Regions:
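Non-catalytic regulatory appendages
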Residues: 1-252
């Protein structure tokens, strides 16, 4: 980002913040719901992960969930969901891990090490979940929570590399957090008194457009570049109309 523009003046005040971006402050983004699912799937898909040379398996997580008072059936459903895209189960699992307490000092050293690692991972989930889902937080508190999550993820990845999460996933989650700060700064510059909701970021708007395109064209799914551009333009107009008149939609 070139020095001297308003966006640089705003974001350069943040120590260690990554100011690399495209033309005119363009940044990539990843949908927060998909990022959360990937945290869940990364933990479960590999059957184990390692932080600070402490191996965490699904059985260890199951034991910790049972210690919270969850039933065996509930713990199994959270760790072995029939639908890998089940958003509610994913939130429940990450929230449960974020609620794990610290171990008693008189426990065995291996148990203390395991609890410490899970408690640390739970802090990551806590900050991410509350930043996006706690409606009582102010924007300043949301940004503070995202910053805390980013610092923890950076430290964990620096120490553990792919034993913690894959490098591509690390890039994606850090890009998601970075984009929130960029979008906030752009809004602050364009309209200092405007309201800003980070939960509206992501790909929901794009997915809504493609769903509308699919509904409009039916089985005629093949298209050249010009046809697709026309379809998307029509879909966007329909979505804008329905946002102004929701009573005209299918649910009315």
């Amino acid at each position: 980002m070139p020095e001297g523009n308003k966006l640089f003046d705003t974001l350069s005040q943040l120590p260690l913040f990554n100011l690399l971006c495209g033309h005119d402050g363009l940044t990539c983004d990843f949908d927060w719901k998909h990022v959360f699912k990937r945290f869940r799937n990364t933990d479960l898909h590999k059957n184990s992960f390692s932080i600070d040379h402490v191996l965490i398996t699904i059985e260890i997580i199951r034991g910790q969930l049972l210690s919270l008072g969850l039933s065996s059936t509930t713990a199994n459903s959270l760790l072995s969901p029939n639908d890998k895209q089940d958003f509610v189960l994913m939130i429940k699992l990450l929230s449960s891990i974020s609620s794990l307490p610290e171990c008693d000092a008189d426990e065995r050293l291996t148990v203390i090490a395991t609890c410490r690692v899970l408690h640390l991972l739970g802090r990551v989930y806590f900050y991410l979940l509350h930043a996006y889902l706690n409606i009582k937080l102010s924007l300043d508190e949301q940004l503070t929570y995202l910053s805390a999550a980013a610092h923890l993820i950076l430290a964990l990845y620096h120490s553990n590399k792919h034993d913690f999460i894959p490098v591509q996933f690390y890039f994606d989650v850090m890009s998601m957090i970075k984009n929130v700060y960029f979008c906030m700064a752009k809004t602050q510059i364009d309209n200092p008194v405007a309201q800003f909701w980070i939960i509206l970021l992501g790909t929901d708007g794009l997915e809504k457009v493609f769903r509308k395109v699919q509904t409009m064209v039916g089985s005629d799914t093949n298209a050249d570049q010009l046809q697709l551009a026309n379809w998307i333009d029509g879909a966007v107009q329909c979505i804008n109309i329905l946002e102004e008149h929701p009573e005209w939609g299918a649910d009315s």
